[in-house]
Amino acid sequence: MATIEINYHNIKQNAINLKKEAKDIIAVVKNNAYNLDLKECVKIFSEAGINYFATTKEEECKIIRETLGEEVSIFLLNPTRDFELVRKYNIEVNIANLDYLKENIDELRDLTLQLEFAGSMRRAGAKTLDEVLEIINFCKENNLNLKGFWSHFSFADEFDGFYEKEKELALKVLEEALKIHDFEVVHLQNSASFLRDGAFEKTTHQRLGIILYGALPYDVKQYPVALPNLVIKNPITVYGEIVNIVDLKEGECIGYSNAYIAQKDKKVGVVNIGYGEGILRDRLRGNTCIINNEEKDIYATMMSHLVVEISEKEKIGDKVFLYDDIQQLHDYVKYFGPNSVQLAALNYNSLNVKKIY
């Protein structure tokens, strides 16, 4: 059975290293902590000194509270109408827009609120500076507890000029908002924004997700980094093993629909891992794996198997690594998009899971 090793010690060290660079951290733990186990991750983040968490689901807020107790702050990124739950578990609520406030004012009077500026993401929040100011004034007039201001950059991992524009707008809106309200918490930056710019002066926290889990949000070899001393450790190792060695004659094929045709007589390895384990096909097709510390081509991909290049020294039982310290998750962003796509796809029902502390 193919194996995934999750190194929680490395995730904790990432949190420690990031805390040294940030003003303070709100750890994003949405979708089961990027599919790396919500309870495990919030425990180690808490041990690393992080006491503020954000997620998109009410049920995950409940789990965080039950796991860590009353000493931590929890922010629900999505607007909610489950006011009974957020009240019971002391969850901070996101303001969807001015209408949301007006429609639910009686439910919101005893809750803690955060104001989102929609920016260019536009999933929720105030769309204009005027709406931001209206919301602030509405909260003041109605004695609502407005604690935070936040936004989310949709172009922070792009280097085509759009990020600079959305950043400039968000900072201008924040500057105007601060003239009429003293926010206890201000968080604008995600992992990519923080990595390329460092901490913004007028923020109190950096809201970090993917970088906590060991994946860099863009190609740091090609694009600038504002945190040159930051060390991020890889927590994910995924491997199968060679379960059969097949001799192919020149012109013979292996796999579905002539997936690979031998150009000469050769041996190939059959490996007990495929896209059924949640490894994205774009990661596999035309790419490489590591066997005995050497890079080898992947010839064919199947749901439960790979066919890979081998030499005479490879043997049945040898491990075949798809993700490790040599080939890390972020090395494949150019093939399949955000790192979170791969993390979310991992199929733990088909993998032997080893946890390292």
Where do the protein language model's features map onto the residues?
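Short aromatic-glycine motifs in intrinsically disordered, low-complexity regions
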Residues: 1-3, 133, 137, 224-234
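Active-site metal-binding loops of divalent metal-dependent hydrolases
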Residues: 31-32, 153, 191, 210-211, ...
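Anionic-ligand-binding alpha/beta catalytic cores of soluble enzymes and soluble regulatory domains
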Residues: 160-264
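C-terminal accessory subdomain/extension
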Residues: 245-357
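Active-site-proximal beta-alpha core segment in soluble small-molecule metabolic enzymes
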Residues: 2-6, 10-13, 23-178, 182-185, ...
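Short beta-strand-to-turn element immediately C-terminal to the catalytic PLP-Schiff-base lysine
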Residues: 126-127, 196, 243, 310
